Amino acid sequence: DEFEGEIGGDVKYAITPNLTADLTVNTDFAQVEVDEQQVNLTRFSLFFPEKRDFFLEGRGTFDFARGGSGEFGGFGASDTPNLFYSRRIGLNSGSVIPINAGGRLTGKLGPYAIGLMNLQTAGEASSSTSATNFTVVRLKRDVLRRSAVGVMATNRSVATSGTGTNVAYGADGTFLLTQALTAGTYWARTATTGVNGDDQSYQGRLDYSADRYGAQAEFLSVGSNFDPQV
C-alpha cells in the first residue's frame, strides 16, 4: 500500500536570548478546541478568541492601538477596528484552511519590539477558498514612562501577481500622562484591489481610572472602505 498523507512540523530557534524565530510546515490545528456556538443578531462580525499556540505566542507584539490589557485603559470593548486579527489566517467561518508553510520572528532588538510573520495557506475547494499569502510587520518602541509608539503593516494577496490584494498600514501610540490618565491614538489606511476612497481610520482617546471613579472620552473615525483583511 502506498503511503498517503503529509509530513509537517514546527521548529523554534532562539537567534538571541530576546529574539525567537518559528517555522511551521503543513501546520496541524486538528487538536485545537472548537469555538462555542454563538448567535449573532447584529450586523457586526463576531470576534472569537485565538486558541492556536502558533498565534498565541508573542501576540502582544502584534497588538495595534491597544494597551497590554487589550484596550488603552482596561475599560470595556471599543469599536476600534483590528488591523491584525490572526483568525483570518487558516480559518474560514470556523473551518480549518491548511497552512502550507510559514515563519514568524518575534522579540526585542535593542530598544525595539519587533514582529514579522509570513504564512501561505492552501486553496480549499470545499469552501471556495483560494491559496493566499499573509504578511504582517510590526515595530514598536517604549518611550517616556510606560508609553509606546509603533507602526504596523499587513498584506493579504490571493495570487503572487497581486490579484485580490489588500494592504493595511498605520501608526499608533499610547501614553501614560499621569498614574490615572492614559491617552491613545492611531491612524491607519487600507488599499484593496478595485476599491478607492474613504479608506482611512483614526482615533483619539483619553482614559481616566482612579480608585473610585473612571471615565473615558473618545473620537473614532472609520471610513466606509476601510477594510483590513489580515
Which residues are covered by each model-predicted region?
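Residue-level signature of outer-membrane beta-barrel architecture
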Residues: 13, 107-109, 140-143, 175, ...
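Flexible, surface-exposed loop regions and adjacent strand-edge segments
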Residues: 39-43, 202-203, 222
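Outer-membrane beta-barrel translocator domains and adjoining extracellular loop/strand segments
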Residues: 35-38, 125-130, 160-167, 194-202, ...
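Residues that define the transmembrane beta-barrel architecture of outer-membrane proteins
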Residues: 3-7, 97-101, 108, 130-135, ...
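Aromatic-lined, polymer-binding surfaces characteristic
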Residues: 112-172
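Residues that cap or anchor secondary-structure elements
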Residues: 1, 29-107, 118
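Repeated loop/turn-to-beta-strand initiation elements of outer-membrane beta-barrel proteins
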Residues: 19-21, 111-116, 144-150, 179-185, ...
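Transmembrane beta-strands of outer-membrane beta-barrel pores
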Residues: 27-31, 109-111, 118-124, 153-159, ...
